[in-house]
Amino acid sequence: MLSAGWGVPARLFSTLKRIFMKILKSFAALAFALMLAASCKPAEEAKYENTNAIWLWGSHMKEAPIQEWAQKGYGHILLNEAAFDKWGEEDVYAFIADCDKLGMTVHIWFQAFYFDGKWVSPIDDEKRAIKQDFYDMVIDRAKGYVEKGVKGIHLDYIRYGGTAHKHDFPECRATDSITEFCRQLNVAVKAINPDVILSAAMMPEIDSEHYYGQNPAEMGKYIDILMPMVYRYGYAGEDKSLEWVHEVSNWFEENSDQADVWVGIQTYTSNLENGDVIPMDAEGILSDCKDITNTNCTGVVLFRHGIGEFPDLNDLWK
């Protein structure tokens, strides 16, 4: 510290002291800013080169304009496994190969806990234990696809049908049963191909554990991409605000552990009086996609082909 005892003139000493104190304050401000920055979660960076995806029903596979989609900047197709029953394995795997040549990854989309038109609880209420035999059956389906070269597995109905709280026991928690399935699936398919992409459709609710058993923070430890279905038009009988879209999307990104979050959006609106579906034009869908780029999420998934006009998304994330 400067001292007047060094023989420095009083006026010069006073000037030097003021300069020195300003420098100290600047360093203190810089240190505080660095500390604040370190405490904040950094902006999420996409792990995948292309993060634009489409949900595609199996029955629509043959009509899907995949060359057009590739040109418009879509990189992932979530193909419902019903395509195998509709078209046969040979045609489905040929479709997957064609998409791969165009730079698009096909994920097989199937229902985890919805079988033969009915919800299946992953917990045996009498035994108060998970239904391991059912887990094994579903996981074996996924393993079969990965063994044949499928690069992505997309889980739909990876939840309870609104009744999780009725199957929740101290010995076997409802949320744990969903997470445990994700863990077992991860271990099984990554042993075949460590790079296979696991994704899951999520209910668009900040607290979905009570009804659906989904805990994104735990599921995100085993699932690569969480896809909350943030359907703002006609959800629960009303159109949701843009603020709701941002709030839900960002909540998932903040509570997804290591998983990426790609937001599912509609390609249609709804008539709130009679429920009729109203296809959206490309401009409207693009506007909703751009809204997602204003969140901390890193991708969009359009639901679905067959309704609405898909926009060009090549410049969406630039």
Where on the chain are the PLM-derived regions?
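Boundary/entry segment of secreted carbohydrate-active catalytic domains
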Residues: A43-W69, Y268
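Aromatic-lined carbohydrate-recognition surfaces of secreted/lumenal glycan-active proteins
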Residues: W57, H107, I178-Y212, A259-Y268
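Catalytic domains of carbohydrate-active enzymes, especially glycoside hydrolases
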Residues: H60-D85, K148-G152, T295, G299
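Aromatic-lined substrate-binding rim segments of carbohydrate-active enzymes
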Residues: L78-Y114, F169-I192
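Active-site-adjacent "subsite" loops/lids of carbohydrate-active enzymes
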Residues: V92, I96-A97, T105-K148, I278
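Active-site groove signature of glycoside hydrolases
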Residues: M137-C172, V301
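Aromatic- and acid-rich polysaccharide-binding/catalytic face
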Residues: Y212-L242, H305
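Substrate-binding cleft of secreted/luminal carbohydrate-active enzymes
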Residues: Y231-G237, W262-K318
